[in-house]
């Protein structure tokens, strides 16, 4: 069963400022919680919903059946946002939503290899039509590359110890399953550190997932494209779940909400010198106490919202 608790649902819908006749894009369809809220607010408007996962798409089509005609499903990664919409004759939109949490069903489907809680082949591909998987990262990347991604993408302070342990183990035979990898991570991390801060494999698994799916580069490009696509007064809402994604979002929003250099002595700022984006949220919106109690995964969620000005 495809269960997925939607995070910051009403806050992000409010952030989009939906018009009944507007054009909206959900870049991360997942369990369709956000898409359902957008679709029910549309009359003559249209929602374009992206996901590269067949299971998520099948479930979402069922859930959004009451809104048939208002929703177009697109099986693609959001890095192809501009091209996919252009193929459908869409060049401007009124709102774009990103929810960067891996949907719980993908985490919980043992055979997908995302989770350190289930034994499964090392996989972690969001798009299963691609060949490159967690197996290739773990068994083929050099000690230096592994240590770098564990530290940079996972913020893992024992990155070198874990990379060294993997390098030693795979010299005997390939590392094939999630539990084999979990055991190596546990061996590499000193016992006192293993006992605090959640599951010892959490950061390493996050880093490998980001590397397999090239998540940070893909996200950076997609946010830039989404801002390009926005019509004047259109909104972009981004929900992130760790500091790396939030940093990218914050930086892109900051760059595109700054004034170009102004000629000295102007009494008023001419239209052409106004920044492209206006920040709706100076600080990110976080989950309420009630949501934190209902959904543990919301505790690291941050929502940022910006509006196109020109």
Swiss-Prot record:
One of its GO terms (cellular component) is cytoplasm. It is found in: Cytoplasm. The keyword S-adenosyl-L-methionine applies. Residues 290-310 are annotated as: Disordered. Its EC number is 2.1.1.199. Keywords: Cytoplasm, Methyltransferase, rRNA processing, S-adenosyl-L-methionine, Transferase. S-adenosyl-L-methionine binds at residues 32-34, 51, 78, 99, 106. It catalyses: cytidine(1402) in 16S rRNA + S-adenosyl-L-methionine = N(4)-methylcytidine(1402) in 16S rRNA + S-adenosyl-L-homocysteine + H(+). InterPro entries: RsmH, SAM-dep_MeTrfase_MraW_recog, SAM-dependent_MTases_sf. One of its GO terms (biological process) is rRNA base methylation. It comes from the Bacteria. One of its GO terms (molecular function) is rRNA (cytosine-N4-)-methyltransferase activity. Belongs to the methyltransferase superfamily. RsmH family. Specifically methylates the N4 position of cytidine in position 1402 (C1402) of 16S rRNA. This is Ribosomal RNA small subunit methyltransferase H. It comes from Exiguobacterium sp. (strain ATCC BAA-1283 / AT1b). The lineage of its organism: Bacteria, Bacillati, Bacillota, Bacilli, Bacillales.
């Amino acid at each position: 069963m495809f269960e997925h608790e939607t995070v910051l649902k009403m806050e992000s819908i409010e952030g989009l400022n939906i018009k009944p006749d507007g054009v909206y894009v959900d870049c991360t369809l997942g369990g369709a919680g956000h898409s359902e809220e957008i679709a029910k607010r549309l009359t003559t408007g249209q929602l374009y919903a992206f996901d590269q996962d067949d299971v998520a798409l099948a479930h979402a089509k069922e859930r959004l059946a009451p809104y048939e005609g208002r929703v177009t499903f697109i099986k693609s990664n959001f890095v192809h946002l501009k091209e996919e919409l252009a193929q459908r004759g869409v060049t401007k939109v009124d709102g774009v939503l990103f929810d960067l949490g891996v949907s719980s069903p993908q985490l919980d489907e043992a055979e997908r290899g995302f989770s350190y809680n289930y034994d499964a082949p090392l996989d972690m591909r969001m798009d299963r039509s691609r060949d490159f998987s967690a197996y290739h990262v773990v068994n083929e990347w050099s000690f230096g590359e592994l240590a770098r991604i564990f530290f940079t993408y996972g913020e893992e302070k024992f990155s070198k110890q874990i990379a060294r342990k993997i390098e030693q183990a795979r010299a005997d035979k390939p590392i094939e399953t999630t539990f084999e990898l979990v055991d190596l991570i546990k061996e590499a991390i000193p016992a006192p550190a293993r006992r605090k801060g959640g599951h010892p494999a959490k950061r390493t698994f996050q880093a490998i997932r980001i590397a397999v799916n090239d998540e940070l580069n893909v996200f950076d490009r997609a946010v830039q494209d989404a801002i390009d696509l926005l019509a004047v007064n259109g909104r972009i809402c981004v929900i992130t779940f760790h500091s790396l994604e939030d940093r990218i979002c914050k930086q892109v929003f900051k760059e595109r909400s700054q004034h170009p250099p102004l000629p000295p002595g102007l009494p008023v700022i001419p239209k052409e010198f106004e920044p492209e984006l206006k920040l709706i949220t100076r600080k990110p919106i976080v989950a309420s106490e009630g949501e934190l109690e209902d959904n543990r995964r919301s505790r690291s969620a941050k929502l940022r919202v910006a509006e196109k000005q020109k």
